[in-house]
From Swiss-Prot:
Keywords: Cytoplasm, Protein biosynthesis. Responsible for the release of ribosomes from messenger RNA at the termination of protein biosynthesis. May increase the efficiency of translation by recycling ribosomes from one round of translation to another. It comes from the Bacteria. Belongs to the RRF family. It is found in: Cytoplasm. This is Ribosome-recycling factor.
Length: 184
């Protein structure tokens, strides 16, 4: 039988982890090192993630410091951050870029909550797809005579309970992120 509760849980956890990383990339008006995770810097004859050419730290709630290790890459890192679409304007200070995080206006907050909602819905869909795969495995196992009808029903309920628990966790994560975004 190809059904595995551990596999289903692992895949559902993966959907939640993916949601968490998506949420980390949303600018909430508060400084976070994860805010710059998606930035790619043209360096060394290719495109390199910012985290591989610099260290990012939070100076205070509204300031990030990016310490670029190679001074020849500072300008490229500055341009990459400005062109990222995050609305950030770094200030060069030697090999360090200081990035003030501007407060969000109401319109942008509403827009970010909608984006967060889309990310959460994608996570719910991923969880439901894992449920569907698990249910299909159970149906096949019952059809092939590997499990009884009663065992099939019990395992189906188990998969549904897991799904409900993970969807609830997605909803809780969304509620927390929306509260963080709307906080002035």
């Amino acid at each position: 039988m190809s059904y595995s509760k551990q596999d289903i849980e692992r895949r559902m956890e993966g959907a939640l982890a993916s949601l968490a990383s998506e949420f980390a990339g949303l600018r909430t008006g508060r400084a976070s090192v994860n805010l710059l995770d998606s930035i790619q810097v043209p360096a060394y004859g290719g495109v390199t993630p910012l985290s591989q050419v610099a260290s990012v730290t939070v100076s205070d709630t509204r300031m990030l410091s990016v310490n670029v290790w190679d001074k020849t890459v500072v300008g490229a890192a500055d341009r990459a951050i400005r062109d990222s679409g995050l609305g950030l304007n770094p200030v060069m200070d030697g090999q360090t870029l200081r990035i003030p995080i501007p407060p969000l206006n109401e319109e942008r907050r509403v827009e970010l909550t909608k984006i967060a909602g889309k990310y959460a819905e994608a996570a719910r869909v991923a969880v439901r797809n894992v449920r569907r795969d698990g249910m299909d495995d159970l149906k096949k196992a019952e059809k092939d005579g590997e499990i009884s009808e009663d065992r099939h029903r019990a395992l189906t309920e188990e998969v549904q309970k897991l799904t409900d628990a993970f969807v609830k966790r997605v909803d809780e994560a969304l509620k927390a992120k929306e509260a963080e975004i709307m906080q002035v």
